[in-house]
């Protein structure tokens, strides 16, 4: 029985008995030889200063388990071998060993004596010592101690009591979690368990964690309040009684310093967002909390976990029995649980704000949801539902923004394509969804960039597209934008799908039917889909080419927005066609279409023709002149059996001409045997044995039987003389047998807007990195030509330094114009430099004589001309200014007439002559102007006025000819006029009560009242500053100036 009961003495939680502690050391030395061989014995522990309790604790430890909190076996030890032993020996602890053993064993002896159990006698012999050694070896070799026997009933209540003490709460005086750093960087936060935990254990631990967390918060508050300092005092004042912005800033700082102990401020921010009242306060708190979540509160690589997802079954093992480590885990887990609930509440508030009546609030809530969805995985499902739901917003701005935000989300996280498309699909198939929301959702799906690794997603998208396609066809809603969006989506998803052929093949007949009734843009999408399907199977049918041949004459081609897409489709179709005569028919019709198109499309079509000629050299025979392609009239035989000839004009037949031809070919005697008209289509069954036409039929439906091989591409000759220089250059290049070498986009480079942009002489705004990134989905990247001459301003030195042969033909006009302008400005500068010379005294005196009158005191009649010199001087000043203005205007705009726009045929001499003569004006009224008969044919009033003014005294050309060298004296007869000549003016104003004779005389032809006339006179005085107030102000101002001048003169004299 002793051997069975002996292992109970070595239980970790049971104190050691004093009877076994007091043993003869000599006997122990004899019996511990086996333990010394293993390298671990009681004697070794006692020699190092330990006790028997230390020996038993070390003996029961498992080497594979953690020794201390955070320590593991195999960790790097910095201590060298024997270093610890030497340190303990230096302490001289051996003399205290026996005394410490006796003192520790006394309380254990008292406790064991009080129990009513069978006492084990003292170990005084070898048998008991051997049994003890065997039990120690068993404990040391096993991971856990052996189970207790039924006979030992004293240990069971002790274990139950220990289990009950696990959930007891003990207050501490120090913080378990130190402030600073991110809370999710602690190793405790990543511990979780996928197994469901018992609910009773979880509830008990949660209660304990709540108490621990509350005590931790209270302890943190007490220590914070006890701190003394300016920063802490200021922070407390701001949080409690500050403005909204200051309070938010202070709370952010506190949360960033220690998020675990400031969870109350996180809850305060959420309540501010929820608060109904000021929208400005709500939006401010919304942005603040969003930034806080992204930067500090939410981890990057995982979601937040609730409290029940923690490994409570391994909690004691993880903490190694250390209560502080266990409590730290509980506090951190409880904090994360509470934070997860607050974030979920915030997401619900975002959902409420996204349905607000104000557009600004909805937009801000949508943007916040998108940023959280892009940056953090927390609540991503709820946030994704919110953003996708905004595709159906009644306001188009919000729906468009939601589509754009989803595109940017997929650009940042491409792995979310399946999740996002599934959510959009659920939106599409809702029962109460609007058609506009469906359209926006389809537009988002067809903009999704796919890859060959995502064939399942492509198949799923094609299924959704054709489901809505059938719905649109059944509703006969083929003119809607939805059909075009669906066909666009199928075109983009088809190359990446694996089972798309079967689904498309079912709808081929429907696509051909829809092709002829929809608008041009939608028909281009349908043709592209048909070409992809047939080209992948190498079975491009004649039906497709006939439909494409017919679509080329659609008037919508001129105004559609998919001209580049259509030309690309034509190029691919012709390159894949093996029938050469059908390719000739397409090229012929394409050149015919260009006759009514704008220059950008013509340039693009000519470039396409050049590439087709490069791919199929057999088409070069069409460049040769055929007899039917001449512009002259031709006579050909109608039939081989008849001698009759008919008169036709090749390539310009109409239905009326055909009727006349058939009537002429029929003999007059046999009118009843008239031949039927030739049909515009040919049945397949009638191909064998039929006669081929030897002429071109432009109205044929089938390009195989239009006879395009019998004519030439004479349209190129007409295009070679086109008004647009680039069109003419492209056409001449093809006629000469060369290929067009062009690296740009003709549809964009030759537009009117691009031409007008060349007149804006400033550097364009730089594009901020959106063209060469993935932010612009499904858009072609822009080509940047660093040395492209088209990016140089046309008036720059670099542009003008180029040779004319290096300039594009559409910009030769700018090059020639600014070259001549530069030469003209240089000549003007040279002339101005030559004119700036020193003036001699004699020349200066002669110049003064032209302005001053030498005989002003000799003749009395000239004394009456008081303002003669003033008028002439002002006139001379005006002459000079007008001369300068006229010369400047001539330099800039004098030669831009209609006849002089084409500067290619104008020589430099002619340009200079026109410039010199263009700045002068004719002298209309000269000294002999009275003899001109055209000027004498006027009314009586005009002749009297001209006599009274004296036309001889006014020189209107003087302002353009500069100062006269000879002074012209005034005629005395112009000043003295008889009263008979203006007597009719006196008769009209007879009886009026105002001044009608003096200097301020006023005419009153409409017999206005005196009050009205006075008001007009006062108003005229006020306008010309002749009223009393204006005169007084002038006098005061004059006095002030005079005072200032006198003061200045006095200072200068001093």
Curated annotation (Swiss-Prot):
Q: Where is this region: Disordered?
A: 1-42, 102-160, 873-902, 915-969, 1031-1054
Question: From the Swiss-Prot or TrEMBL record, what is one GO molecular function term?
Answer: RNA binding
What segments bear the compositional bias annotation Polar residues?
Answer: 124-138
Keyword Phosphoprotein part of the UniProt annotation: yes
Task: Locate the Phosphoserine modifications and list their residues.
Answer: 113, 629, 835, 959, 973, 978
Where does the record place Acidic residues bias?
A: 21-34, 882-902, 915-933
Instruction: Kindly state which keywords UniProt assigns to this record, in alphabetical order.
Output: Acetylation, Activator, Nucleus, Phosphoprotein, Transcription, Transcription regulation
Q: Where is the composition biased (Basic and acidic residues)?
A: 1-20, 109-120
UniProt-annotated location(s): Nucleus
This entry carries the following GO cellular component terms, namely:
CCAAT-binding factor complex; intracellular membrane-bounded organelle; nucleoplasm; nucleus
Q: Which GO terms describe its biological process?
A: positive regulation of transcription by RNA polymerase II
Q: Which domain of life is it from?
A: Eukaryota
Q: Which SUPFAM superfamilies match?
A: ARM repeat
N6-acetyllysine occurs at which residues?
A: 695
Entry's Pfam families? Answer: CBF
Family designation: Belongs to the CBF/MAK21 family.
Which function does this protein serve? Answer: Stimulates transcription from the HSP70 promoter.
- The protein's name: CCAAT/enhancer-binding protein zeta
Q: Which organism is it from?
A: Homo sapiens
